[in-house]
Every structure is written in C-alpha cells, then in structure tokens.
C-alpha cells in the first residue's frame, strides 16, 4: 500500500485522504482503517506530511548539509575556532563538537549557527571529519609509567592546546626517564581512546644538557641543525677560493673600494657596498652579494636541502643555517682581502633618490675592510680615532650617509610605513640561562645598510618585471579594510583626528597618523597595532607590490646565504638569456618554491617567538616579587598587558584588580566602578611580578596603586584627576635590563576576548545556511578577535 500511496502523491502532488482512498479503492471501512494506519506510520517516519488544509504530501528529502574545509585552532579549555581561506571571521566550535581534532588540523565542518552581528556572536560549526593531522611528531621528556605495561611511558606535549598524553611504544634501548625524545605519531585520539600512540624516532638529549630547552623547541618544529651526510660531502668538495676559470666572464671590481658593514658577531658576511660621487651630482651605489648560486647547483643535494630549509633560523643562542658553514662562513662570506664571486646591482641614483641607470651582473670583488655597525656609527658621530684607523673609507662612509638620507626621504615621500618597534636581545651564559635583556640598537649605520638593500631589491625586481620573465617577488598586499578600521578606532581613542574611511586610507594617511604621535608614550604601542593590521608579507610568482614599502616592485636579492628565494633570484640572473626553455622551467617551479619559502619563514618566526617568550619568562623567574614601573601596552576585557622597559610583557588579569572594572570596547579602557581609576594604552603604572613560567612563556603581574593612576573627570576618585600635574617620580628599581615581544603571538590576549563584529556585508555563511544546513541548539555563544 505504501508504494501505491507514494506513486499517487508523486503524480498528483497532494491529495485529501478521502480522494486518496477513492483513487486506491480503499473506501470500505476495513480498507480505510488500513489506509489510515499506513499514512500514520509514513508520517512518523517522515515519509509524508499533512499540509495546513489537511491534504497529504510526500515529505521532501532533506538537502544534504553543505560542508566546508578549514583549519582548526584549539583552545586549551577544549573549544576552538575554524578559519576558512579567504574569510576574515572564524567559526566557533564547542568542546562537544571538536570530534577529536587537534590544533592545526585540516577539518571538514558543517555550520550549525550563523553569526548575529547585532548580538556580536560568531557563527558556530561542528567538525564532522579530520582531513589531515597537523602534528606528525612530538618532542618531550619521557615519563616512565607502569600503569600501561605495553608502553614505555608517555610524553606530555608542551603545547597547552594538546591535553592528551602521548604514549610511547617500548623502544630497543633502555630508557631512564631523563631523555628528551622525538616521537612519531602512529595513532591519534579517537572514540576508542583519548590519547596518542607514538614510536621513538630519536633521542634529542637529556634534561640536564645545556641548551636542551631551545633544542626541544626547534626539534618539535622539525627544525634540525645537522645536515645529511650527502650534503656535507658536497659542501666539502667546494673549493676554499675561486680559481682563474671561475672569474671568466665576470665584471672585475677588485680595484673598487668595497667593504662590508655587519654586526660585530656576524660570521656570514654576504653583502658589501661601494659608492662614488659622480661628476653630474649623482651617486653610484654598488651592492655586491655573495654568489651562492654558483656553488649550489640546482638539483644537487645542497640545493634540495636548502629548499627544504628555505631559511636560516635565528634563536636566542644559536643559528640553524640554511647552508653548511663551509659555504656560509667560508667561500660565500665576503671576508676582507680575498677574492670573492658576487652578483652586483650597480645603480646610478640622482639627488631625489631615483635610480636613473642600473646594471645587474656577475662580478668578482675584494673587500677592503670588515666594518661593524658600531665602527661606522662612531665615525659618523665624529670619533677621530676610528676615523684615523679607517681613513681610506671615511669619505665613502660620509657619502653613504648622505645617500641614505636621500633614499629614506624618497621612501617617506611615496608613503612607506615605518614599523620601528623596540626589539630585545637576550644574552645567555654557557649553560643557556638568560642573564640580561637589552634593546637592539638601530643607528645610522644599521638604517643605511637597510636603505641600500631595499633599493637593490627594488631595482632587481623592476628589472625582471619589465623583461616580462617569470620571477619570484616579495609581496605585501593591501590590508583588509576591517583591520584598518580597527586601527582607526584604536587611534581615535587617543583623540587623534582621522579623516576618510578605512577603504580610502592610503599609506600617506597612515604615515601622517604615526607622525602625529611621535614622542607620545603610546607611540610604540600604536606602531605595533598598525603592524598587526597589516597582512603578512610573503613570496609569490605574481607581483602585487609591497604595501608597507609603498613599492611597486620588490624582491629578495640580498641574502642568498640565509634565504632560498634570494638564491633563486641569483640563479635567474645567471640563467636568463640562455634559452627559451629556461624561462619555461622557472615558470613551472616558482609557485612551489614561493609557497615553500613562505611556509618555512612562518615556521622560523614561530620558533623565534616561542624561544624568546620562554627565555624572557625564565629571566623574570629571578625577579618574582619585585616592583617596577611599566607601560600599558594593551587593554582587553580580561585585563591589561603591560610592558617593562626591557620589552618584557606580562598580564594583569582583571581578577587581580582591586575592584570591579568596566571594559569600554570603543575607547579600549578599563574603569574602576567605585574609584574611577582608568587604564588605557600608553599609560604608566606600577606593577609587581607575581609569576613567571618558563614552560608556558607566560608572565603575570599585579597592579599597585600609585601616583601614576589616572581618574576620569566627574568620577569619585581616591587619586589625582586625569588632568592634574604629575609629580616627578624617581625610584631605585632593582635591575631589570633594558631590552620581549608579545608572548607567543599574543595567544593569551585572544584566549577569552570575543570582540563584536562590525556591521557590514552579509557573511558568506548566511547564504550557506539558507541552503539547508541544520542549525544546532544550545551552542556556546560568542565571537573572538583573531
């Protein structure tokens, strides 16, 4: 009977029961009762439904849920967010919908709830499948455990977002419990078991080994110092000096007065410069870069390993090089008074900073001096003793300083943004323990060399763009309007008048904002906020210009010892012009090289930040209980981030403040309900160091009331009025050296802060929801700041 009912309704769309009974010949009392029972059963099974007029209709099959692919970002409390490519807003995933996904996994999701901009809640999603696991290996100390006799013990990941234990299969060697192991994941958490299972791949070291903490971070990211045997053998075959044959066909610049300018501890000297003042008033600037590509042949073991690494990694007490030291510190280092093969960008630059003529070619040089930044800065400051020591190049140094001023002014005129922020240098002893944190100095010499490298990179990029040849660019795309708007709102909270909308905001306008706040206590913080509103620079085979530099063309040509894209640019300088097949080859390989280089660069940055946060926290462990003056660097719903003069940043959680505080999202302030004490960015406050945790890289402060406290006018106050005169304050603080960046990519800043979304275009998932995605009930509400 069911088949007959379905066939009739398919043909007639809908029908009253009496009409259906008549059509099927079921009008008799018994047959009619059977018909009604069948209809009732089909309704319960959602095979048909009653319309408002009492007629019957076949139930439509539910449209299949639309699934999306994204990256899962876990929170240590169990929930997380999924980011989708090309979308600004992430989707919230409740702890019950995570489906055993791990931080960084590529996942398949369905949207269960759309965003509500009026309420400031984010869209919500459910993970239905893990497409690819991000974590393949884990590094950590083995904990011997007899509770699970089939395993040797377990490792607990340092990543706070991974709460599950990693059980380790018994290896062939006897473990003592002091080993730091690198293990390969065999099984991931699932419905069957909420833990990992792994196999020992390597013994990294022991907990008592000096520097093991840094090595553990590097190994956990698969950043390995040792080179494969095949690579080292190839490096050994590279000669110590160029031969006469190596010099054939090269422009001989050995008679030019060229010299290197680097940090005092630099060993890989990969760039040198020369300068001449021409009769027409222009400058000739030569930027000479070690010709690494001459020794690293494409497809060789050296080349494959260099591409795999793609960049050198610089952490507190060591460098993990892209190339073996025999090359980077040997024949590819432009040491004084020895012949070296180079590739050179020789530019004629007019008094306005415009390159009017250039040559890019293979050269040979012999540098005159190995200068340090401090040497050059001293000479420019009038140090007569240094000037006498290096008198042969003093005229060149002064000409270079003049040209640097011209180039810097040119960049400012066209709208280049200056993201100068304080950088810390952490000094460690032989055991790897931090003993001091100092600020990195950027004098004229440092900025001068930067100017010369920038103009060389621009010139090389424009040269190949105009030749319309496949090329690799360093691009920095325009910022998203939403992020610029957040920066505008942030800057406006300081009383800065800003004209125009975010979508119309030019580099010159942003530059003008930063010029207005020069010298203000919040200038550095505002500069950091501007930097965070930018997109991340990356490598690409397509030229999109460089927004931050306001440059139409840009590449990386000047550091082939430590960056693979630079090595590729050198290779193209040499190979182009040989045949049409060369261009076709580069066109084919460049996309993957650009992607690999960008990915490895991000990995290196993550490693550098994690080590820096760890070492800063370790340094501050010795200062727990001490009091200092600090500056508020960020205000969020859950508290204040404050920065010490040495750039160490810590959190004052809102629960550690003495009363209830109201958070003003627009002005980014916290104001005490009773006292009116108000905290805003750039304000100086007194703090006490409460906790420093090397393992997590976290530092906690507490607030101490002081004469620095600001009370908003019109509010009851225990302290001074905001516009009152400040008394001079001089305290003899115990030593915290000058010289930290925000901890681990500001993870703690974003952990609980759910900033409301601005009204704007309809999110893409509004449309997805209309196509039949079922909405969940009882999901956690909230949105987050990325």
Where are these regions (language model features)?
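Append "with occasional cross-activation on large, charged helical scaffolds in nucleic-acid assemblies
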Residues: 360, 373-644, 658, 662, ...
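Conserved catalytic alpha/beta cores of large enzymes that bind or transform nucleotide phosphates
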Residues: 312-413
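Phosphate-interacting basic helix/loop segments used at nucleotide- and nucleic-acid interfaces
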Residues: 184, 253-260, 264-282, 400-414, ...
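Charge-lined substrate channels and their catalytic hotspots, especially those that engage the 3′ end
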Residues: 1-286, 293-339, 370, 375-378, ...
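Intrinsically disordered, low-complexity linker and terminal regions at domain boundaries
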Residues: 105, 125, 653-699, 711-719
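Intrinsically disordered, Lys/Arg-rich low-complexity segments
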Residues: 711-786
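Short, surface-exposed secondary-structure boundary micro-motifs
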Residues: 112, 186, 633, 690-692
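Residue-level marker of beta-strand positions
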Residues: 106, 180, 354, 627, ...
């Amino acid at each position: 009977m069911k088949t007959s009912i379905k066939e009739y309704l398919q043909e007639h769309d809908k029908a009253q029961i009496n009409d259906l009974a008549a059509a099927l010949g079921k009008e008799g009392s018994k047959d009619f009762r059977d018909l009604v029972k069948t209809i009732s059963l089909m309704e319960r099974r959602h095979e048909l439904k009653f319309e408002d007029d009492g007629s019957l209709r076949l139930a439509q099959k539910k449209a299949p849920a639309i699934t999306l692919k994204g990256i899962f970002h876990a929170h240590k409390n169990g929930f997380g967010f999924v980011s989708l490519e090309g979308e600004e807003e992430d989707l919230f995933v409740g702890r019950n919908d995570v489906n055993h996904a791990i931080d960084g996994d590529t996942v398949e999701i369905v949207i269960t709830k759309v965003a509500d901009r009026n309420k400031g809640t984010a869209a919500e999603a459910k993970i239905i499948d893990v497409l690819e696991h991000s974590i393949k290996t884990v590094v950590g100390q083995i904990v011997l455990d007899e509770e699970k006799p089939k395993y040797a013990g377990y490792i607990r990941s340092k990543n706070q977002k991974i709460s599950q234990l990693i059980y380790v299969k018994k290896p062939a060697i006897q473990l003592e419990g002091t080993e730091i192991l690198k293990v390969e994941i065999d099984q991931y958490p699932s419905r069957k078991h909420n833990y990992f299972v792994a196999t020992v791949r390597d013994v990294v070291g022991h907990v008592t080994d000096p520097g093991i903490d840094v090595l553990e971070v590097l190994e956990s990211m698969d950043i390995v110092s040792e080179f494969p045997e095949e690579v080292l053998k190839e490096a050994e075959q590279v000669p110590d000096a160029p031969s006469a044959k190596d010099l054939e066909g090269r422009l001989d610049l050995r008679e030019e007065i060229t010299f290197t300018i680097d940090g005092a501890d630099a060993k890989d000297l990969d760039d040198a410069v020369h300068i001449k003042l021409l009769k027409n008033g222009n400058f000739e600037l030569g930027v000479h870069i070690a010709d690494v590509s001459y020794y690293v042949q494409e497809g060789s073991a050296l080349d494959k390993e260099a591409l795999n690494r793609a960049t050198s990694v610089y952490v507190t007490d060591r460098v993990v090089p892209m190339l073996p030291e025999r090359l980077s510190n040997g024949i590819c280092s432009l040491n004084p008074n020895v012949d070296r093969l180079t590739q050179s960008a020789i530019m004629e630059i007019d008094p306005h900073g415009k390159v009017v003529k250039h040559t890019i070619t293979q050269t040979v040089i012999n540098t005159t001096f190995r200068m340090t930044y401090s040497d050059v800065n001293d000479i420019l400051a009038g140090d007569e003793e240094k000037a006498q020591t290096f008198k042969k190049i003093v005229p060149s140094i002064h000409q270079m300083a003049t040209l640097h001023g011209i180039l810097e002014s040119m960049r400012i005129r066209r709208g280049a943004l200056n993201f100068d922020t304080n950088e810390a240098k952490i000094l460690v002893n032989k055991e790897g323990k931090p003993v001091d944190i100092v600020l990195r100095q950027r004098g004229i010499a440092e900025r001068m060399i930067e100017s010369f490298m920038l103009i060389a990179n621009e010139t090389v990029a424009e040269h190949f763009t105009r030749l319309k040849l496949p090329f690799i660019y360093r691009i920095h795309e325009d910022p998203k309007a939403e992020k610029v708007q957040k920066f505008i709102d942030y800057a406006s909270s300081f009383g800065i008048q800003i004209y125009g909308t975010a979508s119309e905001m030019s580099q010159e306008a942003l530059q003008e904002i930063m010029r207005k706040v020069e010298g203000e206590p919040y200038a550095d913080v505002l500069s950091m906020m501007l930097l965070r509103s930018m997109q991340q620079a990356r490598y690409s085979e397509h030229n999109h210009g460089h927004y931050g530099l306001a440059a139409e063309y840009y590449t990386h040509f000047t550091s082939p010892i430590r960056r693979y894209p630079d090595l590729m640019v050198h290779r193209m300088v040499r190979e182009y012009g040989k045949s049409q097949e060369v261009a076709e080859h580069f066109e084919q390989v460049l996309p993957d090289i650009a992607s690999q280089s960008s990915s490895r660069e991000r990995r290196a940055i993550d490693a550098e930040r994690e080590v820096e946060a760890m070492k800063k926290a370790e340094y501050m462990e010795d200062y727990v209980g001490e009091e200092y003056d600090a500056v508020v660097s960020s205000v969020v719903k859950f508290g204040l981030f404050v920065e010490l003069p040495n750039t160490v940043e810590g959190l004052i959680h809102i629960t550690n403040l003495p009363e209830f505080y109201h958070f003003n999202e627009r002005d980014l302030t916290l104001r005490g309900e009773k006292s009116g004490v108000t905290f805003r960015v750039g304000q100086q406050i007194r703090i006490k160091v409460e906790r420093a945790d090397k393992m997590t890289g976290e530092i906690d402060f507490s607030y101490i009331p002081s004469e620095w406290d600001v009370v908003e006018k019109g509010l009851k106050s225990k302290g001074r009025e905001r516009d009152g005169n400040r008394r001079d304050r001089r305290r003899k603080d115990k030593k915290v050296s000058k010289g930290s960046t925000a901890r681990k990519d500001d993870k703690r800043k974003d952990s609980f802060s759910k900033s409301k979304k601005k009204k704007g275009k309809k999110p893409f998932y509004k449309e997805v929801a209309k196509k039949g995605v079922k909405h969940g009930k009882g999901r956690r509400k909230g949105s987050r700041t990325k």
